[in-house]
């Protein structure tokens, strides 16, 4: 009886910790009428990505060690043609790519003359997809640095929200490199 009860208690405690962690993560507030910190044109100046692979529409907030970016998901996104025509769902790898682009903007924002640098992602860990992203959704990305940039290497944790719900999360390691 003791061992069985102990196992049940452990499962319950794990589930409680998981629920508490999910509720501690707050979605950033987003007012679509507020002027962005970076618009799509400024993002194009900093990132090498172009349509259809530029996956950040605007940045609404930048702090010393965090950034909040936006991606509006429309029915016209090219990936919906094949993923999936009858029930369009944004591919998880593209959610992670969009989050990485927001993280790249955070890293670039920390250097002088960011146009002269690029970020390259070296590692992505702990990726979790929690909910489907579909046409009509607005993804709000919050990415924060876990430690100061050292030797051109940055570690970050990112969350993607639709409304108040976390739809994706991941940890990243990126290198900042001067362009040739």
Residue ranges and their predicted role:
Residues 56-57, 124, 155, 169:
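Hydrophobic residues on conserved beta-strands that form the core of alpha/beta folds
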